C-alpha cells in the first residue's frame, strides 16, 4: 500500500499520470500543431505588412530586402519578447476555471480558435486587406467559448474594448502622424534648401525613434530578458539615456558625414545646374565656356559677325557630323517679346558655307551633311520639354546641340537623338525645320512616326502638340499658332483632359521628396521598420501560437490553470511560420499598405512609423484599446490626405474598414462551427 502511494506520488510529480490521462487526446495536439503553423503563416502574410509596408512603398528597401529584415527581427522578437503569450488565451478573454473538469473542451476550443482565425486572415490576405490578427483570435475565442460554455465564460468588457479600438486606433494615430508630417513638411520639405534644417532635426528624429521603441520593447516585460523586473521609472530612465546618447552620436558623427555626402552627390550634379558653382561647370561641362569677350563666327564670304552673349556664351567644339549653334540670348522672362519679328520666312535649303543667319538674329553653323538633310516641306516637328530631363529649369539659359556625353560627366549617358526634347526645343528656337529628319526616321520606323501625327479635317497631317510645345511654336513660326488654335477649338475636351492629367502629374511630382531629403530619411525609416518588426514578433506571435501554448500546456499538465513557462521552441516555431507566410504571400498586403492606399515617400513613411509606434506606447500606458494594424492604416491615410487630398484611395480604405468590422463576427462564426463539430460529433459532450 505504501509502495503504491509512493509510486503515485512519483508519477504525479513527473507528470506521467497526467500524460496518461490526456493520451487519448494526442491527436488533438498533433492537429493543433498543424493548424497553428497555418495560423502563423496567415499572420506573416497579413500582419507583417504593418512593419515594412511603408518602407517598401517609399522605395527605401526592396521587397526581398524587406523580407530578409523582417524574417530576422520577427524571429528574434518572437523568441525574446513573446514569452508572455501563454496568458493571452488562457487568462485574457475567457474564464479558464470553467474548464477545470473538461480539459478536452478547452483543447478543442484552442483548435477551433486557431482554425477560424487562420481562415479569415488568409481570406483577407487574398483580398489584400490588412486586418488585425489580435481581433481575429479574439473573435474566434469568443466563438468557441459560446458553443462550449455559453455566455458565462466570456469577459464581454474585452469585446467592448475591441469595438472602441476600431475608431480610437486609426483616429489617434492618424492625428499624431499628420501633426508630425506637417512639421516635417513645413520646416524641412518646403524650404528652398531643406538640407540645413534636415540635418539639424536629424538628431531629434533619431533620439525619438530610439527612445520610443526602446520604451515599447522594455515595457512589454519580457521575462527572458529580465524586463519584467525593471520598474517603470527605470525603463523611462534607460530609454531617455539611450535616446540622448544616440542624439549626440548622430550630431557629431552622422550629420557631418551626411552633409559631405549630400554635397558630393547632389550639390555638384550637372543636372541641377543652378546649384553648380563656376568650378563644377568648367570641369564637368567643357563646351560651356564663359567668355567676357565677344564671340566671332565666320559668316558668308569670310565675314566675321560678332555676337554678344550677356548671360552665358555657348561654344561647341567643331566636329564632323555635328551641329554648332551660337545665338544671342536676352532675359528669359521677356524672351518671347524680343523674338516677335515681322517676318519668320527663312530659306535654309541653300546655306552659304555651312552657316545661315536666322530672322531673329541668331547665327547657325552646321556641317554640309546636316545641311543637305534639311529639306523643308512645310511641315515642322516639335517635342515636349520633359519635366524629368533636369534641363527644364534652365533650358532658356543654355543651348547646345552636342552630345550629352560632352556635358555629362558619367560615361553611361546616352547621346542625344533627333527626337530628344532638348534637341527639338533648340531647333524650335532657331527656326530650323526637322521635317526631312522626321521623314527619314518615319521610313525606318513607320509605326512610331504615326503616333506623333494627327489628321485634320482638311486632310493634312499635323504634328500632335500639347501645352509645352506652344512656346516652341510661337518662337519658330507664328503661322503654327493658327493651326494650334484650330486644333484647340476642335478638341477642347482633349485639351482639358491633358491639362488635368498634367496638373495631376505636377502635383504628384511636387509631393515627392528631393533626393537629398530622401537620403536623410531613408535610414530612419529602415530603423523604425526594424524596431516595429522586432516588437511585432514579440506581440503578435501570441496571435499565432497563443492557443497552441494553451493546448500544449493543458495536454502536458492536465491542468487548465497551470502557470508553467512558455517553451522557447514553441515561440521559435511560431516565428518560423510567420516568416514563411511573409515570403510566400506577404507581398499582397505590403502592396496595399505601401502603394495602393496612398503614395509613400521616405519622409512621410518615417512620420507614419514613428507616430504610430508612439501612439501604441501612449495608448497602452493610458489603458486605451489599441490595434497596431489600425494605427498604421490610420497613419497612412491621414498623411496621404495631408500630402494630397486626391492621393488616398478612399474606396480601398472603405473596404479595409468593412473588413475590420466583420473580422470578429466572421472568425467567431467559423470557430463556433468547428467547435460545434468537436462538441457534438467527436467528443459528444
UniProtKB/Swiss-Prot annotation:
In alphabetical order, the GO MF annotations are: sodium:phosphate symporter activity
Q: What's the catalysed reaction?
A: 2 Na(+)(out) + phosphate(out) = 2 Na(+)(in) + phosphate(in)
The cellular location(s) given in this protein's UniProt record come to: Cell membrane
> What Gene Ontology cellular-component terms does the record carry?
plasma membrane
Domain of life of the native organism:
Eukaryota
Q: Where is the composition biased (Basic and acidic residues)?
A: 496-513
Entry keyword Hydrolase: no
Membrane-spanning parts: 25-45, 66-86, 106-126, 162-182, 201-221, 234-254, 517-537, 565-585, 606-626, 656-676
Q: Per UniProt, which keywords does this protein have?
A: Cell membrane, Membrane, Phosphate transport, Symport, Transmembrane, Transmembrane helix, Transport
Q: Where is this region: Disordered?
A: 482-513
Q: Which stretches does UniProt call biased (Acidic residues)?
A: 482-492
Give the bilayer topology: Multi-pass membrane protein
Q: Does the keyword Membrane apply?
A: yes
Q: What is its main location?
A: membrane
What GO terms describe the biological role, i.e. biological process, of this protein?
phosphate ion transport
Q: Which family does it belong to?
A: Belongs to the inorganic phosphate transporter (PiT) (TC 2.A.20) family.
PANTHER family attached to this UniProt entry: PHOSPHATE TRANSPORTER, SODIUM-DEPENDENT PHOSPHATE TRANSPORTER 1
- Briefly, what is this protein's role? Sodium-phosphate symporter which preferentially transports the monovalent form of phosphate with a stoichiometry of two sodium ions per phosphate ion.
- What is the protein name stated in its UniProt record? Sodium-dependent phosphate transporter 1
Q: What is the lineage of its organism?
A: Eukaryota, Metazoa, Chordata, Craniata, Vertebrata
**Gene encoding the protein:** slc20a1
Amino acid at each position: 500500500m505504501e509502495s503504491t502511494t509512493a509510486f503515485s506520488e512519483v508519477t504525479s510529480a513527473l507528470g506521467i499520470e497526467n500524460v496518461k490521462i490526456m493520451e487519448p487526446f494526442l491527436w488533438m495536439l498533433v492537429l493543433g500543431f498543424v493548424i497553428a503553423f497555418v495560423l502563423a503563416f496567415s499572420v506573416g502574410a497579413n500582419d507583417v505588412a504593418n512593419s515594412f509596408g511603408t518602407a517598401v512603398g517609399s522605395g527605401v528597401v526592396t521587397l526581398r530586402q524587406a523580407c530578409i529584415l523582417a524574417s530576422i527581427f520577427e524571429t528574434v522578437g518572437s523568441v525574446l519578447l513573446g514569452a508572455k503569450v501563454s496568458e493571452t488565451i488562457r487568462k485574457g478573454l475567457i474564464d479558464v476555471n470553467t474548464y477545470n473538469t473538461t480539459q478536452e473542451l478547452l483543447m478543442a476550443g484552442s483548435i477551433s480558435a486557431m482554425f477560424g482565425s487562420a481562415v479569415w486572415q488568409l481570406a483577407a490576405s487574398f483580398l489584400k486587406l490588412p486586418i488585425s490578427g489580435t481581433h481575429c483570435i479574439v473573435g474566434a475565442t469568443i466563438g468557441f467559448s459560446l458553443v462550449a460554455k455559453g455566455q458565462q465564460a466570456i469577459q464581454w468588457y474585452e469585446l467592448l474594448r475591441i469595438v472602441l479600438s476600431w475608431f480610437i486606433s486609426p483616429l489617434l494615430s492618424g492625428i499624431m502622424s499628420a501633426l508630425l508630417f506637417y512639421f516635417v513638411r513645413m520646416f524641412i520639405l518646403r524650404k528652398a534648401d531643406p538640407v540645413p534644417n534636415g540635418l539639424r532635426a536629424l538628431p531629434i528624429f533619431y533620439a525619438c525613434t530610439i527612445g520610443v521603441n526602446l520604451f515599447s520593447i522594455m515595457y512589454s516585460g519580457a521575462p527572458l530578458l529580465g524586463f519584467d523586473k525593471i520598474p517603470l521609472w527605470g525603463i523611462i530612465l534607460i530609454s531617455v539615456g539611450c535616446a540622448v546618447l544616440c542624439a549626440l552620436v548622430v550630431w557629431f558623427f552622422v550629420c557631418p558625414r551626411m552633409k559631405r555626402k549630400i554635397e558630393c552627390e547632389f550639390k555638384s550634379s550637372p543636372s541641377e545646374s543652378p546649384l553648380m558653382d563656376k568650378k563644377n561647370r568648367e570641369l564637368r561641362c567643357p563646351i560651356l565656356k564663359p567668355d567676357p569677350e565677344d564671340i566671332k563666327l565666320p559668316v558668308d564670304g569670310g565675314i566675321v559677325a560678332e555676337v554678344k552673349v550677356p548671360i552665358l556664351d555657348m561654344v561647341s567644339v567643331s566636329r564632323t557630323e555635328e551641329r554648332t549653334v551660337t545665338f544671342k540670348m536676352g532675359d528669359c522672362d521677356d524672351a518671347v517679346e524680343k523674338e516677335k519679328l515681322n517676318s519668320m520666312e527663312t530659306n535654309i535649303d541653300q546655306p552659304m558655307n555651312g552657316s545661315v543667319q536666322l530672322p531673329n538674329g541668331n547665327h547657325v553653323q552646321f556641317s554640309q551633311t546636316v545641311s543637305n538633310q534639311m529639306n523643308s516641306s512645310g511641315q515642322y516637328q516639335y517635342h515636349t520639354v520633359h519635366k524629368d530631363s533636369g534641363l527644364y529649369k534652365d533650358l532658356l539659359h543654355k543651348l547646345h546641340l552636342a552630345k550629352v556625353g560632352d556635358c555629362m560627366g558619367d560615361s553611361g549617358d546616352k547621346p542625344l537623338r533627333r527626337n530628344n526634347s532638348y534637341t527639338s526645343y533648340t531647333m524650335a528656337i532657331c527656326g530650323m525645320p526637322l521635317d526631312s529628319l522626321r521623314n527619314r526616321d518615319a521610313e525606318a520606323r513607320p509605326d512610331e512616326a504615326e503616333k506623333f501625327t494627327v489628321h485634320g479635317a482638311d486632310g493634312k497631317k499635323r504634328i500632335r502638340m500639347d501645352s509645352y510645345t506652344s512656346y516652341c511654336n510661337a518662337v519658330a513660326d507664328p503661322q503654327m499658332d493658327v493651326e494650334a488654335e484650330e486644333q484647340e477649338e476642335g478638341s477642347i475636351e482633349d485639351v482639358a483632359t491633358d491639362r488635368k492629367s498634367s496638373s495631376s502629374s505636377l502635383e504628384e511630382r511636387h509631393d515627392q521628396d528631393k533626393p537629398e531629403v530622401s537620403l536623410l530619411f531613408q535610414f530612419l525609416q529602415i530603423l523604425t521598420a526594424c524596431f516595429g518588426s522586432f516588437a511585432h514578433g514579440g506581440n503578435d506571435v501570441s496571435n499565432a501560437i497563443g492557443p497552441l501554448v494553451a493546448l500544449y500546456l493543458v495536454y502536458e499538465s492536465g491542468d487548465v490553470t497551470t502557470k508553467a513557462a512558455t517553451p522557447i521552441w514553441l515561440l521559435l516555431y511560431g516565428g518560423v511560420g510567420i516568416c514563411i507566410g511573409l515570403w510566400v504571400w506577404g507581398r499582397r498586403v505590403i502592396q496595399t499598405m505601401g502603394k495602393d492606399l496612398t503614395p509613400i515617400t521616405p519622409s512621410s513613411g518615417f512620420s507614419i512609423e514613428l507616430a504610430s509606434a508612439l501612439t501604441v506606447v501612449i495608448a497602452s500606458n493610458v489603458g486605451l484599446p489599441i490595434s497596431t494594424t489600425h494605427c498604421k492604416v490610420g497613419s497612412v491615410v491621414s498623411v496621404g490626405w495631408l500630402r494630397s487630398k486626391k492621393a488616398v484611395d478612399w474606396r480601398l480604405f472603405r473596404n479595409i474598414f468593412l473588413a475590420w468590422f466583420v473580422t470578429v463576427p466572421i472568425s467567431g462564426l467559423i470557430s463556433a462551427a468547428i467547435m460545434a463539430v468537436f462538441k457534438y460529433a467527436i467528443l459528444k459532450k
